[in-house]
């Protein structure tokens, strides 16, 4: 618009077609699942330079994740008797809907202290419709993708990059996050439903629960990363680099059910060190220590929705010491 104000925008038109011929579980029945999707998405942002060192911005983005077909899903009630099962309403359907997001963000980027400190700060709000998640049906061994009608996410991200002296610099990154399922929605936790088998589908259906007010999956409320860097050219002319790092990952829920025995993943903090030395113009040496305190932590976990109800846990790596010798040709 002028030297201080800029408008950035872009749009995307998507056409998506899928078709699935599903025949499973002894081939007793076959389903042809197909659909066509069309969606227009885009982004618009306004940037404003307050001065030569400071820029603010405001943006709106509409995003889209296409829907699709499930390989397993609840039997329609009309088909229940063909399999000797008791009728129960479906919770997982042949087709799951497209997920959409309206994302709002406001931010500030500025250089301070004669450009020795850079600050990047942003606040955001995301509104989801038909959020896709892994769900379970009352029918045995039937799970797939379902949709949560409405949910929200809001947060704040702060980043500082600073020069302390000719040799020392640092970076600090903080993120704060709040999430919530805002619509009334009932889903079946397969951890609870696993106690019941063929012929007990109506009982499984009664175990469905409202997840309104629950937190979204895999969304830590607080993350932090701090790094202190040292870099110096020695009297020999060789370059020496050293880095000390602290990484904190906050606790979160691994599923939208927020089951305290299965879904709660604890926070952890780890410490890392690295040292790099330029032996010659072509040879370099790196010494690295990761997770120095040998912290026990869970990186992620996943609970199967297709019948066995098992939960797999991915742990963070234990304490590690590594050395690396490099040669530049």
Protein language model annotation of sequence segments:
Residues 4-7, 53-56, 114-119, 167-170, ...:
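Repeated loop/turn-to-beta-strand initiation elements of outer-membrane beta-barrel proteins
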Residues 1-127, 229:
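Structural signature of Gram-negative outer-membrane beta-barrels, strongest in the C-terminal barrel
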Residues 3, 123-127, 146-255, 328:
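Gram-negative outer-membrane beta-barrel transporters
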Residues 18-37, 68-95, 133-146, 182-212, ...:
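Solvent-exposed loop segments that connect transmembrane elements
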Residues 247-257, 276-329:
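C-terminal beta-signal and adjacent terminal beta-strands/loops
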Residues 13-19, 60-66, 75, 112, ...:
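Transmembrane beta-strands of outer-membrane beta-barrel pores
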Residues 1-3, 40, 48-52, 100, ...:
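Outer-membrane beta-barrel strand-turn architecture
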Residues 1, 44-48, 106-110, 158-162, ...:
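Residues on the lipid-exposed face of transmembrane beta-strands in outer-membrane beta-barrel proteins
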């Amino acid at each position: 618009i002028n030297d201080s104000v800029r408008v950035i925008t872009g749009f995307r038109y998507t056409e998506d077609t899928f078709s699935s011929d599903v025949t499973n579980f002894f081939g007793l029945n076959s389903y042809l699942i197909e659909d066509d999707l069309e969606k227009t998405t885009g982004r618009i942002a306004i940037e404003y330079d307050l001065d030569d060192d400071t820029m603010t911005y405001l943006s709106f983005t509409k995003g889209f994740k296409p829907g699709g077909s499930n390989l397993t899903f609840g039997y329609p009630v009309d088909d229940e008797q063909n399999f000797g099962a008791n009728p129960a309403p479906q919770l997982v359907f042949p087709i799951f809907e497209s997920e959409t997001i309206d994302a709002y963000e406001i931010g500030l980027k500025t250089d301070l202290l004669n450009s020795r400190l850079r600050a990047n700060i942003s606040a955001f709000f995301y509104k989801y419709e038909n959020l896709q998640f892994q769900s379970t049906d009352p029918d045995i061994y039937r799970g797939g993708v379902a949709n949560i009608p409405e949910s929200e996410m809001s947060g704040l991200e702060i980043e500082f990059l600073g020069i302390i002296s000719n040799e020392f610099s640092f970076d600090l990154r903080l993120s704060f996050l709040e999430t919530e399922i805002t619509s009334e929605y009932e889903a079946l936790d397969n951890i609870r439903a696993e106690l019941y088998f063929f012929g007990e589908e109506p009982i499984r259906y009664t175990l469905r629960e409202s997840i309104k007010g629950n937190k979204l999956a895999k969304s830590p409320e607080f993350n932090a990363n701090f790094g202190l860097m040292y870099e110096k050219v020695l009297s020999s002319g060789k370059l020496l680099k050293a880095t000390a790092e602290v990484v904190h990952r906050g606790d979160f829920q691994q599923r939208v059910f927020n089951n305290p025995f299965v879904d709660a993943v604890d926070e952890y903090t780890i410490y890392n060190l690295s040292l790099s030395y330029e032996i010659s113009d072509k040879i370099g040496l790196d010494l690295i220590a990761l997770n120095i305190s040998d912290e026990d932590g869970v990186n992620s976990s996943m609970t199967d929705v297709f019948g066995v109800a098992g939960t797999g846990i991915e742990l963070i790596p234990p304490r590690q010491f590594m050395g690396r010798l490099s040669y530049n040709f």
